[in-house]
């Protein structure tokens, strides 16, 4: 591996770096592009784009797989669809792909919000307590309706 930022890495070096990253977890195309450019800022754009295109063609890099994996991970952390959508946009995933994946889990959001709320609090809530948990649900990325449904289920 070249440590000098002025020295151009070989194509094999860049590909090996990409393989190591992809071996650990799924990446979006934009995320992997940013990681490569951060490591080698002077690397030619055409070389990076060619590598990314090749990885997509070989089905080693896929925004679809990344989106599925990322949504599943954040759902396990009891995050809501609004927060997940914002995180995926920040990682360069298309809005159409985000909407498609979130729609696949449409029936689960209310259950996630209710499950999170039941873990946080047991028993009846007074007005101030409802407001506190409502705000916390919104901060976790749940919509107004999902938060209200979760609060009403207690």
Locate the predicted segments by residue.
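An alpha-helical, amphipathic repeat domain used for nucleic-acid recognition
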Residues: 1-154
